[in-house]
């Protein structure tokens, strides 16, 4: 498409989504669930066809020199397809938040005032190489009564198109608007630029991708976003920590998986327990191939315990989300220093304290300014499924609207509703 064509095309998509959003807001729970279950059945029915189409995307990606990790994210295996279908069924089983009325209060004037949960309207979702996001995102938007515009990575264009056809089939079967879910049918990057500025049609943008994508959108978007830029997550081992518990949690927080945004990137250890906590952890990390970047105090403790192969941490390390087997470690004087470090260098994503002291733990919860703050638990729990949300569209470390894992309720808003019996204001 030419530049003008892309702008016109995206404006058409936006108008169609806005119209569809009104129909979605009226849709009942049974109708939305019927669409989700039909899509799940269609995904399973067409599994072989989906893999065949996806193989063409994978072949092109290999020819373009994409690495093994990228190919893994792009590939639709039998397991990935079954997971997509199961996810649709799980979302269908979740309670429908739309139309709930809460916080009802009787006012002295005789009126009743409450809040009703309603859809946001039109949600633009921008993501990269994972075709499963097409289905996951569409499902959450359908269940929450929103229309959505999905712009996936160009590498998955055929896979996304095939999944879009199945979603359209499910919408039709349930009698929902055909344009409630639209997958952008061009790989032209200008489509993203248009999508993130269409304030007249799009209510919110949810980006799912790497740091460079998010940084670009922060600079260029006019539509509000639900997003996080970095996941610089910390665990602090307090002076009153159970060391065995600390070792177990910190091992999991770093080494269960290296790439997720809720993986620990910096370990903070109270000077009072450094000699007991650091050696067993360093042994685990080095056995698993984790590079340790340490402050002078941590180096002294570990070298005294016979450890080598340590790198000196520099200022940039405290700001870095590695997404790799690399860990920064700092020995601190206590809780005040730990909180100060986290609030200075963290990304307001997820941070945890290991302590047996109730007052210390509660102070950490109050004073650490992050979307998820934990006591005696791995940062890897910062996830919509683990929080009981059923599914998530992403994680936000912003403070407005949604914060932390964003599930169905994060894709809704509250409006005030008033019940009266003819009351007038005097």
From Swiss-Prot:
Predominant localisation class: cytoplasm
Enzyme Commission (EC) number: 1.2.1.41
Localisation per UniProt entry: Cytoplasm
A Pfam family it matches: Aldedh
Keywords, in A-Z order: Amino-acid biosynthesis, Cytoplasm, NADP, Oxidoreductase, Proline biosynthesis
Domain of life of the organism encoding this protein: Bacteria
Keyword Transferase found: no
Annotated disulfide bonds: none
Pathway membership: Amino-acid biosynthesis; L-proline biosynthesis; L-glutamate 5-semialdehyde from L-glutamate: step 2/2
Catalysis: reaction(s): L-glutamate 5-semialdehyde + phosphate + NADP(+) = L-glutamyl 5-phosphate + NADPH + H(+)
Enzyme's top EC category: oxidoreductase
Record's function text: Catalyzes the NADPH-dependent reduction of L-glutamate 5-phosphate into L-glutamate 5-semialdehyde and phosphate. The product spontaneously undergoes cyclization to form 1-pyrroline-5-carboxylate.
Protein's name in the database: Gamma-glutamyl phosphate reductase
Originating gene: proA
């Amino acid at each position: 498409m030419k530049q003008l064509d892309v702008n016109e095309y995206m404006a058409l998509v936006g108008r169609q989504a806005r119209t569809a959003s009104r129909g979605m807001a009226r849709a009942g729970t049974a109708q939305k669930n019927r669409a989700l279950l039909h899509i799940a059945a269609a995904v399973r029915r067409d599994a072989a066809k989906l893999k065949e189409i996806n193989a063409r995307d994978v072949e092109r990606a290999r020819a373009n020199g994409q690495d093994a990790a990228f190919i893994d994210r792009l590939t639709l295996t039998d397991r990935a397809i079954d997971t997509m279908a199961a996810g649709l069924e799980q979302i269908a089983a979740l309670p429908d938040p739309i139309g709930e009325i809460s916080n009802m209060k009787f006012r002295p004037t005789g009126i009743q005032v409450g809040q009703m949960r309603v859809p946001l309207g039109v949600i633009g979702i921008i993501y990269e190489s994972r075709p499963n996001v097409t289905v996951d995102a569409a499902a959450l938007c359908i269940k929450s009564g929103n229309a959505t515009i999905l712009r996936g990575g160009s590498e998955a264009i055929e896979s996304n198109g095939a999944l879009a056809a199945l979603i359209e089939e499910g919408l039709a079967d349930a009698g929902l608007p055909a344009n409630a879910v639209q997958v952008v049918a061009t790989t032209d990057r200008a489509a993203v630029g248009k999508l993130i500025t269409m304030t007249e049609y799009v209510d919110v943008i949810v980006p799912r991708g790497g740091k460079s994508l998010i940084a670009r959108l922060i600079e260029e978007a006019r539509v509000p976003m639900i997003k996080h830029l970095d996941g610089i997550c910390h665990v602090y081992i307090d002076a009153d920590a159970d060391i065995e518990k600390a070792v177990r949690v910190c091992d999991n927080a770093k080494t269960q998986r290296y790439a997720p945004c809720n993986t620990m990137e910096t370990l903070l250890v109270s000077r009072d327990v450094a000699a007991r906590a650091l050696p067993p952890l360093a042994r685990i990390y080095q056995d698993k191939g984790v590079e340790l970047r340490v402050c002078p105090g941590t180096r002294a403790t570990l070298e005294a315990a016979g450890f080598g192969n340590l790198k000196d941490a520099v200022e940039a390390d405290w700001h870095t989300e590695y997404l790799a087997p690399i860990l920064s470690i700092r020995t601190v004087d206590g809780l005040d220093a730990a909180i100060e470090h986290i609030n200075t260098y963290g990304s307001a994503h997820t941070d945890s304290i290991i302590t047996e002291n109730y007052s210390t733990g509660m102070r950490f919860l109050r004073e650490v300014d992050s979307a998820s703050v934990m006591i005696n638990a791995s940062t890897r729990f910062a996830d919509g499924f683990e929080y009981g949300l059923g599914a998530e569209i992403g994680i936000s470390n912003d403070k407005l609207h949604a914060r932390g894992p964003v599930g169905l309720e994060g894709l809704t808003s509250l409006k005030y509703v008033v019940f009266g019996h003819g009351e007038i204001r005097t």
